[in-house]
Amino acid sequence: MEKSKVYFTDFRAKLGEGLPMKLKRLLKKAGISKIDMENKFVAIKMHFGELGNISFLRPNYAKAVADVVKELGGKPFLTDCNTLYPGSRKNALEHLQCAWENGLTAMTVGCPILIADGLKGTDDIEVPVKGGEYIEK
């Protein structure tokens, strides 16, 4: 098996070059420009965090990714799915409220935010995979 390339940047920031700018450079170095995004919807899957915790990426990083997608002609949007467990992300309305309270808004990330599985987390489709098998249907 071929070894994967690993890209690294440190957290030190120089005047005029913060972490979001470094993230943009990393994306380009990793080959994001090889992906045809011209006039296509581009989902940026992200965890919006639970209320009261800090285990999610900050809005400025999401904006950096969305900006690169736009530069490549894509139409980015941030997305996540509702949770199966009770909490602040169990339905789309509360999920979006949670995202907003954690600083993730269309204004701060530079693109729309959509909950992928609908209002109650029940909007889904089955996609058959050639050569795949179902464990339980």
Summary of predicted features, one role per range:
Residues 1-137:
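N-terminal and secondary-structure boundary signal
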